[in-house]
């Protein structure tokens, strides 16, 4: 029998678990260091810009929602962490809703919880990857819409898909690979092909386009700002294209293995213990597992094609988070069908232990100097006041330093390390790395006529003793005349 989708009771329990996770994350974050992490500091500082159609190379959705939460609940570390952990929880929640369209409640719960065995989701996203977090949540929301539509063909699923496409398109550019690979996977399966010919799907594209049209118009009109981080791809010169592309493919392979090996290893262990059991998946569940596998294969193939066509010499593991969840579901769903009830409970217990272990490890890491959260921002602010009179200057710097100073001294003129525009008087520049060529940084800041003073190395205080320093490099920039 075809699953009827999640019941209200199942949705209620899933949401309750999400609330528990958010509460646990918040309690541990507030208990492990008062300073902002790098991504937290970025959001804190960018809030000065207010609502805009574009924020340089970053897509706007994360900022819009975070700034809205600041407006409603006030600007605090708690609000930043609640939004972050809510996105983490929603990623699993949406995965459960999507999987529940084809498999039972227990299998869909355990498969969705298996995301905790992906390093980029379980660990890296907890500390950084702000915009990747919201992309992953909206990728799963898109998965819900696809799965719901493939099961029922309902108009509500098409509307959901359109909204998910529009919001996802405002999260990160690699989000667009999600609907592409899901469409390719669905078209490759005869049971789903008829649904994909439904002309009502054009409505989803119209809804999505209506949501993204204004921000994408800003991107078209401001290409320099929008492409400011393209150097991350390490694009080659024509004469080195082949070798750089090979390096990029090696990088992609390396990070794909890093992203999937822990889960592959765990699946192999469990499969060895239930090899004698018959795979008792119902036909719909079997087709859905194939759908997930083909979507993952399409995603990885698109990533390879991108590296080859662009010549990108660098690839990062979290860029694959549009595809790795589907690979996880494709691995876990067939395994769950072969497991006994006891083995399923063990799998669930391991997922719970992984959540607890990850949160505990993060708490230890966050509170261990020179971890970013252990910075004594008040002591740093006092030092800058005494040395440079920073309270009377415009302070620009890397997000980490500037964000923490803006939080500690809200009355200061603190800005990101970008061209500052109109400034009255001198500028105090703070960087995490030494500036070897002050003339170059002045040109980049569009302060070509300014002069740079002597670089001063400061050693900020941390709230606990540390054997390792995290220096900050300071310079006074003086206007001409």
Name these PLM-found stretches.
Residues 29-44, 54-69, 75-78, 223, ...:
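Extracytoplasmic catalytic/substrate-binding loops of multi-pass membrane glycan-assembly enzymes
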Residues 102, 142-160:
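Membrane-interface transmembrane helices that cradle and orient dolichyl/undecaprenyl
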Residues 126-134:
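Short acidic/glycine- and proline-prone juxtamembrane loop motifs at membrane-interface regions
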Residues 157-172, 184, 208-210:
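Membrane-interface alpha helices of multi-pass inner-membrane proteins
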Residues 179-288:
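Transmembrane-lumen/periplasm boundary regions of multi-pass, lipid-linked membrane glycan transferases
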Residues 370-374, 378, 382-435:
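Short periplasmic/luminal acceptor-recognition loop of GT-C membrane glycosyltransferases, typified by
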